[in-house]
UniProtKB/Swiss-Prot annotation:
Active site (record annotation): D136, D462
Tissue: Expressed in young seedlings, primarily in the vascular tissue.
Main location: Golgi
Provenance organism: Arabidopsis thaliana (Mouse-ear cress)
Protein name (Swiss-Prot/TrEMBL): Cellulose synthase-like protein B1
Coiled-coil features, chain-numbered ranges: 186-216
Signal peptide location: none
Length: 757
């Protein structure tokens, strides 16, 4: 591992940020918010029940604001120095790279291929890497694409390393034409050749997608005969085995295709179960001490990504900081994901300053020993396993009870825990053992998914697993390099994006009610108080109910002639509070290079997600708690870079998206997710119409008077935030509100108006 010589410079540096001005802003916002709530309480008797409802909603918003402030209070980052690893090149550990996929239709094979090719081409010794692709759909098309990709990789990987290309996903690299100013004849020739070969690869994959009979001509595909996505045996195939030596830049890493056994009457635990199967198979074949987990729609955008993670893991292990994993910031090449990037940049750094970032499911380098259930207390100062842990973990009966009855698996676990050198075995010799650990019943009565590996009982397996790791006392590190380490694609279209947000929120809320969830670990002394608050951020999804109510309150007050906002001085406090919040969030966007329009669009997106996806996630969890239905892991449809739908020519991070922002290309379908937004817009239109013609009822307030200009401005602001739904009322086709949605929303709006007037 890392050289222990103190004369060597540090591999990484932890940077803590202290901005007293921002802290003053946080405290000012909280102070104004608290004074507004006090005013609500003191004058409740002077107004009707609207003030009580407003107090409830604003109290929820205050708690969320307080929670976010606690997390942002002491941001931190980690700066790696990958160039310094060259002094320790012989000490670099092996890394197993996991790429899970499940559906060749919703996750196109060429997209999976691009991700794999980008990982194969990273700046790291090829004989130290192994790429495992888990295909939960058992698709011959995915396997075919992987085989063809392995042939192209023999051209692509040497090309990338020879010319030190920055982007190593071919679909993204070849979007930009070769520079006319480039006079290097050899480079031009190699560039043209590599591009031609990549286009051949794409055509082969596309042809095979359109004609599945092409796959039947090869004997290698006989194993896929009579297989179904949810009914098939375990498949383990070595696509390519690296047999080269150290420093051979023409070699490519191992490529292994796996698909675990699936039967209709067995629970498979979705992606989480696939990740645990990847952990077992890789343990049997290569057993690298570190694991890089990347979603199939996220490619490596920085060639030094593995080296950056190693800087932290090797440095942390040297100083015994108990670092369990390194999480990279999740970024996208789509032009509609500014909000996610901003949240991760500011909130992610804040959490990194506590016990470490939360594992977000992709772009993360794990330590295998940690994933096998060990805690920092199980190790001595020098990093060796303690005598107590040795007796507990390495006894044969204990190993079988925890990891299953496979002798080969138990041996690999012992080697991984003790950090024994992994001999360069022939991969094909481990195929039978790998198939054994892929059986449906293998995990039965073991600790897989409970305390070992990726944890079950939630569709948000990343958050569940992260809680389990931190509750054992581990820390984690956050890297936010200037060049995004990984870039991914958001789901194709607004309906798919809202569906993904609904799935995420469902998993987050589900953790609150899980009997087997490691959420109980939040009360462990090994997890810091503010880190507990970081995980309790999942309750922000529950604010969708007060958010929906608050969007309707101005309209209700106009119809009912009630007062929502305070008068005089406290109206000024309310306006000041909103103004400071807007200026602060605008600064967050502009500090990352985004425009004012990007900020405006993101404010609208945030409201839409909160009142649609998050709202229906609460409905999903309610049905589960009542025993009516179970939560379902939904695979969202992904787009391929370079296609029109993928916004391949769209701006990168920090660029202005211009007037053709996705806000003005809001696509509708018949999904119920569009119902709340349409309903909100119709209600506010009706309220403004009633107010403008003076058809309000007489005020029943005691001393507060009726509604006025402030409530009308509130309605206008709500409609501005839901502008896509307002525009959808006047458009046709996919950019217009479907008649079914409009009819239901209109009926509900009429009921709301009738009972409000």
């Amino acid at each position: 591992m890392a050289d222990s010589s103190f004369s060597l410079p540090p591999l990484c540096e932890r940077i803590s940020y202290t901005n007293y001005f921002l802290r003053a802003v946080y405290l000012t916002v909280l102070g104004l918010f608290f004074s507004l709530l006090l005013h609500r309480i003191r004058h409740t008797s002077e107004y009707d029940n609207v003030w009580l409802v407003a107090f409830f909603c604003e109290s929820c918003f205050f708690l969320v604001c307080l929670l976010i402030t606690c997390l942002k209070w002491s941001p931190a980052d980690t700066k790696p120095f990958p160039d310094r690893l060259d002094e320790r090149v012989h000490d670099l550990p092996s890394v197993d790279m996991f790429v899970p996929t499940a559906d060749p239709v919703r996750e196109p094979p060429i997209m999976v291929v691009d991700t794999v090719l980008s990982l194969l081409a990273v700046n790291y010794p090829a004989n130290k890497l192994a790429c495992y692709v888990s295909d939960d759909g058992c698709s011959p098309l995915t396997y075919f694409s992987l085989k063809e990709a392995s042939k192209f990789a023999k051209i692509w990987v040497p090309f990338c390393k020879k010319y030190n290309t920055r982007v190593r996903a071919p679909s993204r690299y070849f979007l930009k034409p070769i520079s006319v100013a480039t006079e290097d004849y050899e480079f031009n020739r190699d560039w043209e050749k590599t591009k031609r070969e990549y286009e051949k690869l794409r055509r082969k994959v596309e042809d095979a997608t359109g004609d599945s009979h092409m796959l039947d001509v090869e004997d290698d595909f006989e194993a896929f005969s009579n297989t179904k996505p949810n009914d098939h045996s375990t498949l383990v195939k070595v696509v390519w085995e690296n047999k080269g030596g150290v420093g051979d830049e023409k070699e490519i890493p191992h490529i292994i295709y796996i698909s675990r056994e699936k039967r209709p009457n067995y629970v498979h635990n979705q992606k989480c179960g696939a990740m645990n199967f990847l952990a077992r198979v890789s343990g049997l074949m290569t057993n690298a001490p570190y694991i890089l987990n990347v979603d199939c729609d996220m490619y490596a955008n920085d060639a030094d990504v593995v080296r950056q993670a190693m800087c932290i893991l090797l440095q942390e292990s040297l100083n015994m900081k108990h670092c369990a994993f390194v999480q990279f910031r999740q970024e996208f090449y789509d032009s509609s994901t500014e909000l996610i990037v901003v949240l991760q940049s500011h909130l992610g750094r804040g959490i990194a300053g506590i016990q470490g970032p939360i594992y977000i499911g992709s772009g993360c380098v794990h330590t295998r020993r940690v994933m096998y259930g060990l805690s920092p207390d199980d190790f001595e100062v020098d990093g060796s396993l303690s005598s107590v842990a040795t007796r507990e973990f390495l006894v044969k009966d204990s190993l079988a009870r925890r990891f299953g009855n496979s002798k080969e698996m138990m041996k690999s676990v012992v080697d991984a825990i003790q950090r024994n050198p992994n001999p360069q075995n022939i991969l094909t010799n481990s195929i039978e053992a790998a198939r054994e650990v892929g059986h449906c019943q293998y995990e039965y009565q073991t600790s897989w998914g409970n305390t070992i590996g990726w944890l079950y009982d939630s569709v948000a397996e990343d958050l569940n697993t992260s809680i389990g790791i931190h509750s054992r006392g581990w820390t984690s590190s956050y890297i936010s390099p200037d060049t995004p380490a990984f870039l991914g694609s958001m789901p194709a279209g607004v309906p798919e994006a809202l569906l993904q947000q609904r799935r995420w929120a469902t998993g987050w809320i589900e953790i609150l009610f899980n009997k087997q969830s490691p959420l109980r670990g939040l009360f462990s002394k090994k997890i810091r108080f503010r880190q507990r608050l970081a995980y309790l951020c999942i309750i922000t999804c529950l604010r969708s109910i007060p958010e929906l109510i608050y969007c309707l309150l101005p309209a209700y007050c106009l119809l009912h002639n009630s007062t929502l906002f305070p008068k005089g001085l406290y109206l000024g406090i309310t306006v000041t509070l909103v103004g400071i919040h807007c200026l602060y969030t605008l600064w967050e966007f502009m500090s990352l290079g985004y425009s004012v329009q990007s900020w405006l669009v993101s404010q609208s997106v945030w409201r839409i997600v909160a009142t649609s996806s998050w709202l229906f996630s609460i409905f999903d969890i309610t049905l589960k708690l009542l025993g009516i239905s179970e939560t379902v892991f939904i695979i969202t449809k992904k787009t391929v870079a370079g296609t029109k739908s993928a916004l391949g020519s769209g701006p990168s991070q920090g660029e202005d998206v211009g007037p053709n922002s996705d806000l003005f290309k809001f696509e509708f379908d018949g999904s119920l997710c569009f119902l709340p937004g349409t309903f909100i817009v119709l209600v506010n239109i009706a309220a403004l119409a009633v107010f403008s013609v003076g058809l309000q009822r007489s005020s029943y307030s005691h001393e507060g008077g009726g509604s006025g200009l402030a409530e009308a401005c509130g309605c206008v602001l709500v409609m501005m935030l839901f502008l896509p739904f307002l525009m959808g009322l006047f458009k046709k086709g996919k950019y217009g509100t479907p008649l079914s949605t409009l009819s239901i929303a209109g009926f509900l709006a009429v009921l709301f108006v009738v009972f409000s007037v």
